[in-house]
């Protein structure tokens, strides 16, 4: 794999960023990768307005991964206060998954959380039914906390649930 470069997203990246996220999380294109939610959720994963809101918030950043100038992945880091940061929107182009880019994005997000906020812990939420993804995060040093959070079942901005028993599990890692 060619080493990616990482940089913070800007408003001029939003259209391409939105296409990347949707291609990795929803619909038939997502099924080219192993991390999709297409069997659990239809509809959208996010929209351009939400991405612009994230970029306008000084407590959040979206890091882009580019290879030879081509957008290949992204991750959001958000300051939660008291040394806690949140990792979300981890996205790798479905045609490039299983090549190590996800690990590099997590490492970049953790470094960003330590330097920008400065965080000593990182948390994330994962849909409970995504056991293969939970196991992947565990191999990256994240542990289940035992906490669950409700999935916004009736908010179409986050997708159209194919089942009503969706919920998030919370995972956390101490940042060294």
What name fits each language-model region?
Residues 1-15, 19, 169-176:
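Conserved N-terminal entry element of GNAT/NAT acetyltransferase domains
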Residues 22-51:
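Conserved GNAT-fold acetyl-CoA-binding loop/helix
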Residues 46-63, 164-167:
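A short helix-loop-beta-strand connector motif used in the catalytic cores of GNAT acetyltransferases and
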Residues 64, 70-78, 86-91:
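Conserved beta-strand in the GNAT
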Residues 79-90, 97, 116-120:
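A conserved beta-turn-beta hairpin within the catalytic core of GNAT-like acetyltransferases
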Residues 92, 98-111, 139:
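Conserved acetyl-CoA-binding loop-helix of GNAT-fold acetyltransferases
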Residues 104-121, 143:
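Conserved acyl-CoA
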Residues 120-135, 139-176:
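C-terminal "cap" of GNAT-fold acetyltransferases
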């Amino acid at each position: 794999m060619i080493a990616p470069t990482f940089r913070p997203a800007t408003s001029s990246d939003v259209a391409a960023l939105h296409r990347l996220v949707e291609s990795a999380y929803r619909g038939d294109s997502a099924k080219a990768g192993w991390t999709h939610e297409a069997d659990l959720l239809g509809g959208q994963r996010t929209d351009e307005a939400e991405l612009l809101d994230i970029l306008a918030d000084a407590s959040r950043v979206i890091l882009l991964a580019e290879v030879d100038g081509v957008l290949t992945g992204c991750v959001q880091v958000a300051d939660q206060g008291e040394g806690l940061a949140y990792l979300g929107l981890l996205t790798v182009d479905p045609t490039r998954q299983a090549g190590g880019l996800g690990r590099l994005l997590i490492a970049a997000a953790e470094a960003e959380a330590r330097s920008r906020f400065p965080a000593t812990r990182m948390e994330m939420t994962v849909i409970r039914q995504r056991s293969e993804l939970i196991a992947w995060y565990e191999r990256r040093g994240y542990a289940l906390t035992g906490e669950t959070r409700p999935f916004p079942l009736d908010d179409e901005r986050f997708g159209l649930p194919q089942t009503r028993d969706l919920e998030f599990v919370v995972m956390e890692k101490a940042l060294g």
